[in-house]
A protein has these predicted regions:
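Conserved hydrophobic/aromatic beta-strand scaffold that supports enzyme active sites
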Residues: 72-74, 175, 195, 228
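Acidic/His- and Gly-rich active-site-bordering loop/insert found
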Residues: 2-118, 137-142, 152, 184
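Flexible loop/turn segments at secondary-structure boundaries
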Residues: 94, 156-158, 183-185, 217, ...
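Acidic/histidine-rich catalytic neighborhood of metal-dependent amide-processing enzymes
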Residues: 121-201, 234, 240, 316-332
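Solvent-exposed alpha-helices and their adjacent loops that cap or buttress functional pockets
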Residues: 77-79, 106, 140-142, 166-170, ...
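Short, conserved micro-motifs enriched in small and acidic residues
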Residues: 113-126, 278-286
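Metal-dependent amide/peptide-bond hydrolase catalytic core
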Residues: 1-5, 193-332
Length: 332
């Protein structure tokens, strides 16, 4: 294999690679939308799937879509009996707030590319395709076919790839995914997304929480949390004091507004980050719960807030929940 020739091809294709990543990033493909008969995981992921197949065909690969859930671009002689897989995905988490650029445009600044999906996982998917293109143009003789397989539901459970595997599609003899860090990750955590529901009886206290909302995805640190409060006149001074004296943590900001109807809205801004590395974010929900506790809310609401803060709080390893795990090989 002539690596100098391959590197020269990659250098030649640099601008085309960047433009193609931007082309795919420009398709908003947030999961969780209502399914359609032709779009099992919503129209956004389906549109990104179609765009991926179009791009693959344009660059000379055998391409097809499986049940509008999985896209394939394949390199190598069809007579080769074995196949190596490259696994990626084209669905993304919501863009959220706080962007200084259009998350669906793919902006280049200081030689960096910014946009939702640039790193997870549209950029890596297209980079893998261009690596396959470089192998082909360099005349590398393959012993096995290389199949780039992209799913449309990775962020919400990988049901697309699960369907691909369980339906009897050809399976690879080996594979890897560029949805990770270089050079290698050889293990992956499990995850649970619980949903809890509990009624709160009115307690007649001078501060009551009417609503508390935060986050746009279960696998990301929430960057914004909003609480609407009913505050008795006797408690307004206490609310003002708590807001003024609250020592906002890193990357956090608290604001308070009173509506014409007399309700108060507390807004906590934080810093979103992928759920695999929550220590780098600032959890707006956890910080706002801490503020609400300082207001001395009583009854069942107060007990719930106390429990959430005690068990979860701003911890990122689940110590108080009893789920923290460490070993010498994989770390935390």
């Amino acid at each position: 294999m002539n690596m100098e020739k391959i590197r020269a091809i990659i250098d030649k294709d640099r601008d085309s690679l960047i433009d193609t990543i931007r082309e795919l990033v420009a398709v908003p493909s947030v999961g969780g939308e209502a399914p359609r008969p032709d779009a099992p995981f919503g129209p956004g992921p389906k549109a990104a799937l179609d765009k991926f197949v179009e791009i693959g065909a344009r660059h000379g690969f055998r391409t097809w879509a499986f049940e509008n859930q999985v896209g394939v671009a394949e390199l190598g002689d069809e007579s080769l009996p074995e196949m190596i897989a490259v696994l990626a995905h084209v669905d993304v988490v919501p863009a959220g707030e706080g962007w200084s650029c259009d998350p669906w445009r793919g902006m280049i600044k200081d030689d960096l590319l910014y946009g939702r999906g640039v790193a997870d996982d549209k950029g890596p998917a297209i980079s893998a395709m261009f690596a396959m293109k470089a192998l082909r143009e360099a005349g590398v003789r393959l012993k096995r076919r290389v199949r780039l397989i992209v799913g449309t539901n990775e962020e919400l459970g990988s049901r697309a790839i699960d369907r691909y595997v369980t339906s009897g599609q050809e399976l690879p003899v080996a594979g890897f995914t560029p949805d990770a860090e270089y050079p290698l990750i050889n293990g992956e955590k499990g995850s649970i997304t619980p949903k809890c529901r509990a009624p709160f009886a009115p307690d007649g206290g001078d501060v009551q929480v009417l609503s508390l909302d935060a986050g746009v995805a279960s696998n990301a640190v929430p960057s914004k949390a909003v609480a609407v409060l009913k505050v008795a006149p006797a408690a307004e001074a206490r609310l003002s004091r708590v807001v003024e004296e609250f020592a906002a943590p890193r990357d956090a900001k608290l604001t308070c507004e009173k509506s014409a109807s007399g309700e108060y809205t507390l807004t906590m801004d934080g810093l979103a980050f992928h759920g695999s590395r929550p220590q780098y974010g600032s959890n707006a929900a956890a910080n706002l719960v801490r503020v609400l506790r300082l207001l001395g809310i009583g009854g069942e609401q107060g007990a719930f807030l106390d429990k959430i803060d005690a068990l979860v709080g701003t911890q990122t390893r689940g110590e108080n929940l009893g789920v923290m795990l460490y070993d010498d090989v994989s770390g935390f």
